[in-house]
Amino acid sequence: MNNLLIFLLLALIISPNYGGRNQNEFEEPDQSQHSHDSLHLRQRDHIHRTLRYDRPNPATHNQILEQLVDVYQRTIQPLEDAYHYNDLPERNDLSVGQIKANPLVLFLGPWSTGKTTMLNYILDTDILRTGAEPTTSEFTIVSYDEKKKSTEGVVLVSDKSKGLDALEKYGQNFLERFTGVGLPHPLLRRVTFLDTPGIIENRKQQERGYPFNKVVKWFIDRAQLILIVFDPTKLDVGLELETLFKQLKGKESQIRLILNKADSIATQELMRVYGALFWSLAPLINVTEPPRVYTGSFWPYEYKFNSNSALFKQEEASLLQDLNDVIENRLENKIALVRQHATRVRIHALLVDEYLGKLNKQWTFLDNQENVIDKLLQSPSEFNIFKGVQTKNNISPFDLPSPSVYRDFFSNNHMTDFKPLSQHCGYFSSCLMDQLDEAISTKLPALLAQANKQKHFSESRDEL
């Protein structure tokens, strides 16, 4: 609730002449700028300045990215394939396309809260359709292209280089509600945005004709920044929004709450709405530090109530800085993502190997093999399968999946189809597990150090 206390204090001291710490960062339009004044548009130079549209990637950026892909293909993917990691019912898959893809910024929230308008504002475009009624019925991915173009979902998932091919599993009805928009905007060379259908509390998921929540979860798992946008005039926290926040568990550090259209209500009402928002969301966000809330009006026009304009400008500057941090840290985040994925693949391979070891130990020619397998799957604790993997490999119990995951996994992959880890060793090459361990402990940390060095060099050059 620290954010609320700070906001209340600011609201009490703000006046039309208020000048905050970042006051000079936003200058009022000069009287000579007739084009802005006549249309009542706000200046947007601060967006360009904060996000550094035209700043090219450092020369070493692509080199580090290619090295990361090489580590994945040589040391992680072989174990993925050997133990059918992608057949796990609960997993975060990874592909070369996803590694090379720009960081993803995801817009979520109830209908008509200004998600699409906010995206249009950041990109200085009106190509994405907006309106008072629900207008976004599609998942729209906005990325760079040499010219303005629209791409159907079927085409998007067929191009593996985009890292979206896994979405094909959600069916034709979803693909008809999935579209891509390409724009020749320099910011899109460095980041990709996803606009989503607004949540309507009285609409059942089944009416959409595709697994909406599963699709949202797929994008949540791959997003580096998640903006959840609210309208202060209609806070509606119901079952649909509750489901969304359940899907966001574990991603709290990437969530930003946006109280949009804040200039449409007076200061006292805004204070009440701010408190009501936290009160409504408190049961859904079980973390010590609540997500940051940004209050403002994220569209190109002048604020309606000028008394809070300085606060809104500072809030917008902070949000833009958050977005810029995601862009600037994209290499470090990619390396961390691949290392996390490698750890999951390692745990999976160790568990399959442990199941195989117990099967070979328990099964004799006098036993029915299927009965032994069933016993292992139904009562893994009796054979210390998960406990054995945990203690022998120094793995946290919180990193181990549920035994039910492996009941599902082995129902589609017969246990005897796999070889023990000891048999995945070459005569002239090291074992697959040894290669993976080296990637986790040595190669990926070395790449991270290289990326940090590149980042510090770029920042030092910018200061000159």
Where are these regions (language model features)?
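Switch- and interface-adjacent substructures of P-loop NTPase systems
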Residues: 53-56, 60-61, 66-98, 111, ...
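Conserved beta-strand segments of the P-loop GTPase G domain that flank and frequently precede/overlap
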Residues: 228-232, 257-261, 296
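Context-dependent free N-terminus signature
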Residues: 1-2, 303
